[in-house]
Amino acid sequence: MGGKESILAGQTNQDVLYGEALDQFGPALERLARAYEADSEKRRDLSQDIHFQLWLSFQNYNSRCSLRTWVYRVAHHVAVSHIIRERRTFLKLVSLEELDVLPDKADAQSAANRRMDLNRLSELIQRLKPLDRQVIVSYLEEMDAASTGEITGLSPANVAMRIHRIKNILAKQFHQPLQQGGNHAE
């Protein structure tokens, strides 16, 4: 029974690590899925895939990096694989559904403007190349350049430079009139 107890101990540790990750990063994982997939059904599938792969990955977690870095590394890898798979099937991305935002107490117009701005920003982020999307989503999740570099394989200096460049591109595109077709930063 020593082998069975060892397996159960491994599963328990895997479950504990997954539970910790979910407690700390659950909402961030949902935001990440939203940044990579506009279609609500595909986003649910992506989110489930992220959670499943994350749970599986804890079999190999060795604490050489922080839990946060591990979670984002796995989640971004799954999301990028999803994008590649979707592009191979030539499926057209659909518009992002209305974001779940807390109601603005000021007035209905400012709440509507905020939702429109968030939708516009999400659409622009979705048009970025996967690596740039990964960098900006990490930035928006308040990860430092070193942590983002661990996830992406870029140097912290390269991450900082990309963040600056992406922010400038997004700001410029955000203030331009909406254009149909074409991918930004590709």
Task: Enumerate the predicted regions with their spans.
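A short, charge-rich alpha-helical start-of-domain segment used by transcription regulators
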Residues: 6-31, 44
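DNA-recognition helix of helix-turn-helix
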Residues: 76, 146, 150-177
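C-terminal edge and immediately downstream basic/flexible tail or linker adjoining helix-turn-helix-like DNA-binding
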Residues: 2-9, 16-18, 91-94, 151, ...
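Structural recognition of an alpha-helix C-terminal capping motif at a helix-to-coil junction
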Residues: 45-52, 56, 65-77
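Amphipathic alpha-helical segment used for protein-protein interaction
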Residues: 105-136, 141-146, 150
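Arg/Lys-rich amphipathic alpha helix in sigma70-family domain 2
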Residues: 73-94, 114
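Amphipathic, Lys/Arg- and hydrophobic-enriched alpha-helical face
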Residues: 21-40, 56-57, 125
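Internal acidic/polar
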Residues: 2, 89-114, 144
